Amino acid sequence: MKRILAVDDEPDVFETVEEVLSSYSVQTAGSFEAARRLLVTETYDMVILDIMGVRGLDLLDIAVEQNFPAVMLTAHALDPGNVMESMLRGAVSFITKENIDRLDSLLEELFDLLEKGESTWVHTMKRLAPMLDACFSPEWRDAYKEMGLLDF
């Protein structure tokens, strides 16, 4: 069974993640320090990190150093800057809390892409594009196209 670490400062998020990811072994941490300890002492197949409340980007650096793929989680509306920062620091994907009920299918897709050696970010950007288009003008796409993450 694949091991997942979910890090968030909201206990109700843990309940939802554990319910949605019932086919995985899920461990949770509610603070930066608790998550940091787990990241350096345990092994995970995937890490899910809240981007804001628990210093998720700092935890992302640790997860990447430990070679754990990480999905960034945010309660806030999509922000191309947060998406870009997450990608540049090594996250494999990004999801909003409003879409957390889709986390199981996202992880299945990510594990499949990682196993095949394919880009997780091309997949992620195709999934996020309609939401980003609705929130921002189409210019957000230019930077991602230059990086080879968009081909549409």
Task: Name each model-derived stretch.
Residues 16-21, 38, 62, 85:
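Alpha-helical interaction/dimerization surfaces of two-component signaling modules
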Residues 58, 77-105:
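Alpha4 helix (beta4-alpha4-beta5 surface) of REC/receiver domains from two-component response regulators
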Residues 6-9:
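Acidic di-acidic motifs
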